[in-house]
Amino acid sequence: MSDFDIAKTTSPASRLVLGSTSRYRRELMQRLCIPFDVAAPDVDETPQDGESPHDLACRLALAKARAVAALHPDAVVIGSDQVADLDGEPLGKPGTHERAVAQLQRMRGRTVVFQTAVAVVCQVA
């Protein structure tokens, strides 16, 4: 019996759910060779006024995990987010080719940090 089998038989949560539509996060989870489901979180990703990229990533990771956990109360849910940080300013997804080019030009010669956050929610007592 593997460690995962032992955890599976003693844990009140019956399954693991990744709260993300990111194919990259799904691929990372698949590398663990642990069975999991995927659910799309319905979360507004708009930054709040004055919110740092770090705080934005943390807030969104937790919001995604909570949103999916509300739909899957029997599961351990993993939510995550990553925000590009250019001098303390969050860089969103450009959306268009023109905006992507402008964003890349703005980043040229500067350091961009990727703030990454992971949240785990389990509602099973």
Locate the predicted segments by residue:
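Short loop/turn and capping residues at structural boundaries
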Residues: 39-40, 115
